[in-house]
Amino acid sequence: MKSMASEHSSIKERKCAGYVWRGMTLDESFYLRAVAIVMIMAHNYLHWMPGSPGENEFGFNADRVALMLEGLWQNPWDAPRLLASYFGHYGVQVFFFLSAYGLTKKYSAASPAWWSFQTKRWKAFYPAIILSALGYLIYEGFRVGWGEVWHDDVLNLLRQMVGVSNFIPANVYRPIGPWWFIGAILQFYLVLPFLWRVLQKYGDKVLYALLVGGWILQCVLGHIIYAQFDLNINHSILGHLGVCSMGIWFARRNEVTIPWWLLLLSVVMFIGGNFFYELWIPSRVVLLLFLLPLLRGVCGYLGKRRWCGAVLLLLGQLSVYLFLCNGYLRRPIVEWAKQESHWWTSTWTCIVFIMIVTAWALMMRTFERRIFLVLGRRPR
């Protein structure tokens, strides 16, 4: 009895000291993926609408937040479009965190060989990439013509698929804008086994060095490679070292108490990061300090509701296909919506767009599973 009372008292003290982060279940990670992918899809669609303020995703400009605030003041009903177009891209940071967190939980203790780890990741990732690429060629072939797609897109698409388009300025977003992420995540896979080995020897000091080093690279190297080569550091894993280090750090702990003062400070710093370049540099990391606890709370609540939990789980399980396919399925609906000036047009067409992408992703996953069954492989 005394032991139980002592344990209860200890838990209460930790909650008073701050937010208590505990390891995520698989369902929780799917819920977070679901929210993140909806943020990304809404952003990828709505930032094409006329009057969108832009976003501080790959570069900083304080005028963008000013435009968003001005739009909210002039037309509060347009808030979904303005907020999603400006903030929605942060869903990508949730994915970087979850990738670092999940892979570290799964593999770091075993210290897999470099080549073995790469082949496992390729086998897990490339079926979806290949099917989504074929889906793009078929979709665009019917939409604009096979000759045009073959002449303009095939080479650029192949470079995006293997992750080298990030080093070719004209190819980064062509033909599928969000596929810059493929190159960045493949780079992360390349260095992760080495990082785990170094961590075993030197511990968390490595993560702290990566966190600070990533910010220094952003400030110094980012300007140099942009000026000299027209390349953006945020199209590579170098621009996301802080978030990935954070994911690994949390994965190495079963429980973390984040002090309330640190959560409050992270909110203040993130707000400041929309106005000042110096605070924008660490804004992705400080955002996740309070966003992830918030999302876990919301998802935990919704997950207990039968239909909400089922929808979140489905979207989370489809998140790879949703990410890979949403970029090209924007057309032609986004072109039509851009011609309409009413705020509600962007909102309802965005909902329709997300539903279309979800149906397409379900179809892609069904094809993948059928192919795996024919080949005698276990479906994902």
Describe the function of each predicted region:
Residues A227-F353:
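Alpha-helical transmembrane segments and terminal signal-anchor/GPI-anchor hydrophobic tails
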